[in-house]
Amino acid sequence: KRKLRHSLGRPSRSDFVQPEIISIIWNAIRTEALLYPIKEKTVKKERILGVPEGLPISNTLANIYMQDIDIKYRELDYISYYRYVDDILILVNEDKFFDVKKNICDDIKKLGLELNDKKDEGLVTESFEYLGYVLNDSEVTVRKSSVLKIEQSIEELFRTIKKDNIGYLQWKLNLKITGFILESHKYGWLFFYSQITDLSLLFHLDDVVQKLIKRYKLEGKIIIKRFVRTYAEIHMALHETKYIPNLDDLKLEDKKAILSDIYQMDLTDKDERFVEIQFHKIMKREIRDIEKDIENIS
């Protein structure tokens, strides 16, 4: 992890940035931080270093702060440089390794950032992790803890959803398997891990779902989609598929049916605006639920 100095709040290129935008950024960075553990009287402290995690603009701020380093190292033809927020992956030939390592460490420290002591380095012939993926010379798969997390999340649905609301269980489970598209953005576990090549993992997850259906005596009562099919649709027919829900294509009547039949919401005498607001609110909640399955990927 790295800590961003508050100089980011006052961009050097302020001539090109509206003062109102600079003010918003600065106020966001200085957001009060809670001191844990939370007691009866919550103690707050003004943030003096770093950007709050989970802030809508946190990733954007990181991109702004790191843009010069990104440009410098992406232009080098003897390395492959990748960065996702605060996780950096560099692929380089062994003879250049120590020079590149020293240079990027120096550049990062010049920005006032702190390198995480937990750094991984090694040969690409060995297995290594990046963003929850496990990469080696034969395949790309998902690390065991991330697989366990989605398995536990699926089982929790079976445990907590009452059997008298089978439609809700089927809907939630299928969303977890296929993910969905909303406002042109893709959400879901398999969307995040769509670059895997380890198809045996997907067959394993489908098998886990079938075993849970059998354990909870739901054979023939619910129609569940498959990870294997979803993976194929993502790679071969994403823009035409009906298998993965594109909620942007739903008509008003479709949204009403989902709200009333699945979420058991009374829509009597409710107008179109109410339906749109409630549907959007519920699907934002589903996004938060799905994103829990891919949290803590660093």
Role assignments for model-derived ranges:
Residues L135-S298:
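Active-site and adjacent loop segments of nucleotide-processing enzymes
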Residues S80-R83, L91-D164:
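Polymerase palm active-site segment centered on the conserved acidic dipeptide of motif C
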Residues H6, R10, S14, N27, ...:
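A structural signal for alpha-helix termini and helix-coil/disorder junctions
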Residues K1-V85, L89-N103, L113, G122-S127, ...:
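Conserved polymerase palm-domain catalytic core
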Residues S23, N27, E40, K44, ...:
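A sequence-level detector of short, solvent-exposed, charge-rich linear segments
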